[in-house]
Curated annotation (Swiss-Prot):
Name of the protein in question: Uncharacterized HTH-type transcriptional regulator PYRAB00550
Domain HTH asnC-type: 4-65
Gene3D superfamilies: 3.30.70.920, Winged helix-like DNA-binding domain superfamily/Winged helix DNA-binding domain (1.10.10.10)
Organism of this sequence: Pyrococcus abyssi (strain GE5 / Orsay)
UniProt-listed InterPro entries: AsnC-type_HTH_dom (IPR000485), Dimeric_a/b-barrel (IPR011008), Tscrpt_reg_AsnC-like (IPR019888), Tscrpt_reg_AsnC/Lrp_C (IPR019887), Tscrpt_reg_HTH_AsnC-type_CS (IPR019885), WH-like_DNA-bd_sf (IPR036388), WH_DNA-bd_sf (IPR036390)
């Protein structure tokens, strides 16, 4: 990408590992002053390379003990209003990721739920309220163990 060099790549890689790293620590890793690192980070943000910062959270503290990956086979993967239809789902606190993808199931949704009943309730709403006639079928996988999330190794 134009305007991005090896030092920028290292900065991004380090921020992905630990977005709370200090500018001074980051500067030591790349051989720059904290001020120079700050300028580079601001440039990366303006270019859209860095889109935001987030925390990896243990959702069990919020009573959500079950993580599920829901794949949806769409009737029409190129439906022009798909992004608009997905807006309520994208705003749900417990839905962390939504992807349009290739393959047999063109939509993937990752979310956390209190229990199987709350997951089933979401699946019912997903089919009947949010996706109505857009979903042909769904496939659900329950996450048994999480080893890495948002670039952070958990175990």
């Amino acid at each position: 990408m134009a305007g991005i060099d090896e030092i920028d790549e290292i900065i991004v890689r380090e921020l992905r590992k630990n977005s709370r790293i200090t500018l001074t620590e980051l500067g030591k890793k790349v051989g720059l002053t904290a001020s120079a690192v700050k300028n580079r980070i601001e440039k990366l943000e303006k270019l859209g390379v860095i889109k935001g910062y987030s925390a990896v959270v243990d959702t069990s503290f919020f009573g959500e003990f079950l993580t599920a990956i829901i794949e949806v086979e769409l009737v029409d993967p190129e439906a022009p209003d798909l992004a608009k239809v997905l807006q309520p789902i994208l705003r749900m606190r417990n839905i962390s990721d939504v992807y349009k993808k290739s393959g047999e199931f063109q939509l993937a949704i990752r979310g956390t739920f209190r229990d199987v009943d709350s997951l089933n309730s979401f699946l019912k709403d997903l089919r009947k309220v949010y996706l109505k006639n857009l979903a042909r079928r769904m496939r659900v996988s329950i996450v048994l163990e999480n080893f890495k999330e948002a670039g952070v190794i958990l175990k």
